[in-house]
């Protein structure tokens, strides 16, 4: 037994010695060194990957624009050392793949292999945009090409901030022999266009790489990864490009990060300015030496001074300031007496009420004596400042008659309050002139009715602003709080002034004591009146309109409610009639407990403009709830209430009502009869037109009822125009079933302009109704849809009023347009109803335009538009 143990121990020692001898041999040492070098190479590669990631993260934090523009791309700069290692490994891996992909293991880089051009087949120019910018490449034979001129006319100066927000740069190329040329248009964050010439040697390579045809106009929209996003053989509206770009998921993240970018860009004031030069931030591809230097010092990047964090709150505050908008609508009808109407729209949203506290107060404007400016009263000034800015509007000029803005500028505001001193707010010591007192009595009865309430502690300086001429004016709130102090100060001032007059002062003379004696005598009569109801209550809100306006209150769940849209389109056609009857429309959107309010005043020119209401009242949910309770509008449905001047409800409507019936009923009111007699003596009437043809009224006829197919040409002899008319022959049934109306516009000058509207029956019959269009309406329609009168173009407008497609050339086959219409969601519902009723065009007239799917370029042209 012991012999076995000894034998085993000896064998174990022998094996240990053999292993030691083998490891100490020279060949094994070389193999071990090779293994260690391989391990070190792998460790170096992993460290380089970590450095690249650290550099990417530091760049993400330090440069906001680089962060946003790098959403769809990856970093294309790599270390030269890693490239050498990959070159050594390439023979073992086949040597067929791009080294850029071998260096980057991310999914985006793997997917980019099929999209990124090889270094031999693509110009390096595109690499400067990769991962940072989208690119719009415009190719034309020469700069006088019609399509090129049309596209450049669409690139107006006011669109470059929108392009900059989407990180879109442009390359323009002219490829005709003898006229080779081009330019690179880089757009800065301020909307400025930096132009630099394009090397003519790159134009053939770009044409080949982007597969653009020579001798023809063409455009290509490239993603940030240099992948082709969309191809356009014709000029297209920029809104169509925006839709394609905005469908990207990363574009949605850009929108969130760039809130307020467009407003800030337009605020710079240089949008659309073209400057010759090179944009430093978007330089072309760096040489290898530059890239090697940047890779070796990636940790220094966090020391840059760019800090994007403070810019986010500034952009958000600019978007939340637009809490109230005031719009003015021109009059639709007038008489020779220049009767005009003014509409003031005040819209509110309760989610932005906190931004008013950021306004800087102005403490030295209302008072003239520094010692009478209390420190705690300066918080009320932003309220008046915001209100003045909030209700400022600009009214476009009209041909029929001018109409006034329904706002008060700073100069008018100060002047009115300088001459106006409400009796309820008059302090103990006021020394206005007799003329100012007279103005006070006149204006109080008409205009200052809403502002007579006693303010709360949040608005202690309201009375001081209304008493600008006074030196030592105080409001009622201050009287209640500091009654004893006020009496002492008044007695002291009185004694000082009498002492000065007794000494023979020449400044005041003998008039001052008389005025003071009168005021002292009238002082007891000013104190007894009880305080009016506080602001923000329903009684104060209705007092603002009582004896001055008739109200039409409308409640609707949303602004897209069909019944509300029908009622709105109805009353917008009778603006002048509502102004004569002093009608104010209050529209409340939302549920009973969460609503927003909009107020429209319809006034004549001679009427005194209505003062804007306080923002707190328009956003006060309790006030809106009380208003709905007062008139029985507690349900979340469409509802209309009509009141007289006494604010008492006269009529209720649960469905949209014709305004003619409303006007006839208003004319039976006793208060209205007196107005009619006075207006008849003054000759105030609305000019009657056979058919109102304003642009808004014209387009409202088709909204949610018809689709519009607009054809515009310089003249009726245009070849493209005649070809399109030939394609429309025998299409009455197809157009009628799809609820399409054809609008033909011709002429370039206003004297030559004209148009025809063709209405096809929706039951598919072959009868067609035609209406003439005036020259002014043709001009307005072209301006609204941005149609150039010098070129042939066609538009398809949906029932929602938005342009669905644009065709710069005639469509030989209407099947393409029919397929686009049939793909819309609303049209599918119409098709289901028509098929259930058996409504279908005959096959011989149908011309094969069934509900089947057509293939071709146009299908790809509209693919992804989300119609």
Swiss-Prot record:
Biased composition (Basic and acidic residues): 288-297, 401-412, 436-451, 484-504, 514-523
Signal peptide as annotated in the record: 1-18
Coiled-coil spans in chain: none
Compartments where located: Secreted, Extracellular space, Extracellular matrix
Listed Low complexity bias regions: 301-370
Pfam families (alphabetical): DUF4174
Keyword Secreted: yes
Ranges annotated as biased composition (Polar residues): 95-104
Keyword Metal-binding: no
UniProt GO cellular component terms: basement membrane; extracellular region
Ranges of Basic residues composition bias in the record: 426-435, 471-483
The family this protein is said to belong to: Belongs to the CCDC80 family.
Primary role: Promotes cell adhesion and matrix assembly.
Subunit structure: Binds to various extracellular matrix proteins.
Protein name in the entry: Coiled-coil domain-containing protein 80
The species this protein was found in: Danio rerio (Zebrafish)
Lineage: Eukaryota, Metazoa, Chordata, Craniata, Vertebrata
Gene name of the encoded protein: ccdc80
């Amino acid at each position: 037994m012991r012999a076995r143990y000894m034998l085993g121990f000896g064998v174990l020692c022998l094996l240990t010695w053999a292993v030691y001898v083998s490891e100490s041999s020279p060949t094994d040492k070389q193999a071990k060194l090779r293994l260690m070098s391989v391990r070190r190479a792998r460790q170096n590669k992993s460290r380089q990957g970590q450095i690249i990631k650290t550099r990417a993260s530091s760049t993400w934090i330090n440069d906001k624009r680089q962060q946003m523009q790098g959403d769809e791309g990856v970093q294309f700069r790599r270390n030269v050392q890693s490239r050498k290692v990959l070159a050594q490994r390439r023979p073992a891996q086949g040597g067929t793949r791009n080294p850029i992909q071998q260096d980057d293991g991310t999914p985006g880089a793997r997917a980019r292999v099929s999209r990124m051009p090889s270094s031999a087949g693509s110009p390096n120019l595109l690499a400067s945009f990769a991962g940072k910018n989208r690119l719009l490449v415009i190719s034309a034979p020469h700069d006088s090409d019609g399509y090129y001129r049309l596209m450049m006319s669409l690139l107006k100066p006011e669109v470059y901030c929108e392009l900059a927000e989407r990180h879109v740069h442009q390359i323009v190329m002219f490829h005709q022999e003898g006229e080779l040329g081009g330019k690179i248009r880089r757009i800065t964050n301020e909307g400025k266009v930096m132009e630099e010439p394009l090397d003519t040697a790159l134009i053939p390579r770009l044409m080949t790489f982007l597969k653009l045809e020579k001798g023809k106009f063409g455009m290509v929209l490239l993603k940030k990864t240099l992948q082709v996003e969309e191809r356009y053989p014709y000029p297209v509206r920029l809104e169509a490009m925006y839709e394609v770009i905005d469908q990207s998921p990363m574009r949605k993240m850009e929108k969130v990060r760039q809130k307020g970018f467009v407003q800030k860009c337009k605020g710079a004031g240089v949008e659309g300015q073209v400057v010759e030069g090179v944009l430093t931030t978007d330089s072309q591809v760096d040489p290898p030496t530059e890239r090697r230097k940047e890779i070796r010092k990636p940790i220094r990047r966090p020391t840059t001074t760019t800090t994007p964090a403070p810019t986010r709150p500034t952009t958000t505050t600019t978007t939340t300031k637009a809490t109230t908008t005031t719009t003015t609508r021109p009059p639709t009808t007038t008489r020779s007496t220049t009767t005009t109407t003014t509409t003031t729209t005040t819209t509110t949203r309760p989610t932005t009420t906190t931004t008013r506290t950021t306004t800087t107060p102005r403490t030295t404007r209302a008072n003239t004596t520094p010692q009478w400016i209390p420190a705690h009263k300066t918080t009320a000034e932003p309220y008046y400042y915001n209100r003045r800015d909030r209700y400022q509007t600009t009214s476009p000029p009209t041909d029929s008659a001018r109409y006034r803005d329904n706002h008060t500028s700073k100069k008018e505001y100060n002047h009115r309050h300088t001459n106006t001193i409400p009796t309820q707010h008059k302090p103990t010591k006021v020394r206005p002139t007799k003329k100012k007192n007279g103005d006070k009595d006149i204006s109080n009865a008409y205009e200052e009715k809403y502002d007579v309430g006693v303010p709360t502690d949040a608005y202690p300086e309201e009375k001081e602003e209304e008493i600008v001429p006074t030196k030592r004016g105080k409001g009622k709130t201050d009287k209640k709080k500091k009654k004893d102090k006020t009496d002492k100060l008044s007695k002291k001032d009185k004694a000082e002034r009498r002492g000065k007059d007794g000494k023979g002062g020449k400044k005041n003379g003998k008039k001052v004591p008389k005025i003071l004696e009168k005021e002292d005598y009238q002082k007891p009569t000013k104190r007894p009146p009880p305080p009016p109801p506080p602001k923000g209550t329903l009684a104060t809100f209705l007092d603002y309109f009582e004896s001055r306006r008739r109200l039409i209150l409308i409640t609707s769940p949303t602004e897209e409610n069909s019944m509300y849209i029908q009622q709105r389109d109805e009353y917008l056609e009778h603006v002048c009639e509502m102004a004569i009857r002093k009608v104010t429309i209050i529209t409340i959107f939302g549920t009973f407990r969460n609503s927003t309010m909009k107020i429209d005043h319809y006034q004549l020119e001679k009427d005194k403009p209505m003062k804007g209401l306080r923002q707190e009242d328009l956003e006060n949910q309790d006030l809106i709830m009380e208003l709905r309770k007062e008139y029985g509008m507690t349900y979340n449905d469409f509802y209309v209430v009509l009141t007289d001047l006494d604010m008492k409800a006269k009529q209720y409507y649960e469905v949209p009502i014709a305004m003619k019936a409303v006007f006839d009923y208003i004319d039976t009111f006793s208060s209205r009869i007196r107005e009619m007699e006075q207006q008849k003596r003054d000759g105030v009437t609305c000019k009657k037109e056979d058919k109102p043809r304003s642009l808004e009224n014209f387009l409202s006829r088709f909204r949610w009822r018809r689709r519009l197919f607009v054809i515009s040409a310089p003249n009726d002899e245009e070849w493209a125009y005649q070809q399109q008319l030939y394609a429309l022959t025998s299409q009455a049934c197809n157009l009628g079933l799809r609820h399409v109306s054809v609008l033909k516009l011709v002429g370039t000058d206003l004297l030559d302009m004209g148009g025809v509207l063709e209405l096809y029956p929706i039951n598919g019959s072959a009868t067609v109704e035609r209406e003439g269009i005036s020259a002014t309406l043709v001009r307005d329609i072209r301006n609204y849809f941005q149609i150039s009168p010098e070129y042939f173009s066609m538009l398809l407008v949906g029932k929602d009023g938005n342009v669905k497609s644009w065709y710069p050339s005639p469509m030989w086959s209407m099947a393409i347009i029919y397929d686009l219409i049939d793909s819309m969601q609303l049209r599918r519902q119409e098709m289901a109803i028509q098929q259930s009723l058996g409504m279908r065009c005959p096959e011989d007239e149908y011309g094969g335009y069934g509900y089947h799917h057509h293939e071709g370029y146009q299908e790809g042209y509209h693919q992804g538009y989300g119609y």
